[in-house]
Regions:
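Short alpha-helix capping/helix-loop boundary micro-motifs
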Residues: 41-46
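Short amphipathic, charge-patterned alpha-helical segments
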Residues: 16-26
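Glycine-centered recognition micro-motifs in short, flexible terminal segments and loops
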Residues: 65-66
């Protein structure tokens, strides 16, 4: 299936959840915000939220600082 992650086209094997995609991208499960088709996906739903062909994701890593 074809998805877009942070503006870049990407192939993913279906079915795949947000949590599985984060793992494939080598991103932590905590400290990231995920938006799918302009809707925030709460972290509590990452393991169940199934991505669909054509989904557009924005993944943002949260960084603390001062």
């Amino acid at each position: 299936m074809n998805i877009i992650v942070n503006g870049e086209p990407r192939q993913a094997t279906a079915p795949i959840t947000v949590a599985q995609l984060l793992s494939e991208l080598k991103l932590p499960q905590r400290g990231v915000a995920v938006e799918v088709n302009l809707q925030i996906v709460p972290r509590a739903q990452h393991a169940e939220y199934q991505l669909q062909d054509g989904d557009r994701l924005e993944v943002v890593s949260l960084v603390g600082g001062g």
